[in-house]
Amino acid sequence: MKLQPLADRILVKRLAEETKTKGGIIIPDTAKEKPAEGEIVAVGPGRNAEDGTKIALEVKVGDRVLFGKYSGTEVKIEGEEYLIMREDDVLGIVQ
């Protein structure tokens, strides 16, 4: 897959969602919520500061991140679903 995000945008692949609760109840597809956790697949070069310098992103490829439920734009590339979002949409990095 070849997609290079621009500026401070990142490409995220959602992590697989749980199909069972801790109590063993199977969750049907119609009741599942999209996970708000994913892995960064590609990052842009960073955003431009007012003085013209480039501000590097704090996240990097391979980071596991948390993001808002409605963050980003869903795109389909080579049959796989991804999200393109700004770095500001990332709430935190899972260590």
Curated annotation (Swiss-Prot):
PROSITE patterns: CHAPERONINS_CPN10
CDD domains: cpn10
Keywords: Chaperone, Cytoplasm
Domain of life: Bacteria
Cellular component terms (Gene Ontology): cytoplasm
MF GO annotations: ATP binding; metal ion binding; protein folding chaperone; protein-folding chaperone binding; unfolded protein binding
Biological role: Together with the chaperonin GroEL, plays an essential role in assisting protein folding. The GroEL-GroES system forms a nano-cage that allows encapsulation of the non-native substrate proteins and provides a physical environment optimized to promote and accelerate protein folding. GroES binds to the apical surface of the GroEL ring, thereby capping the opening of the GroEL channel.
Main subcellular location of this protein, as a coarse class: cytoplasm
The protein's name in its UniProt record: Co-chaperonin GroES
Localization per record: Cytoplasm
Family classification: Belongs to the GroES chaperonin family.
Species the sequence originates in: Desulfatibacillum aliphaticivorans
Subunit structure: Heptamer of 7 subunits arranged in a ring. Interacts with the chaperonin GroEL.
GO biological process, one term: chaperone cofactor-dependent protein refolding
Xref: InterPro entries: Chaperonin_GroES, Chaperonin_GroES_sf, Chaprnonin_Cpn10_CS, GroES-like_sf
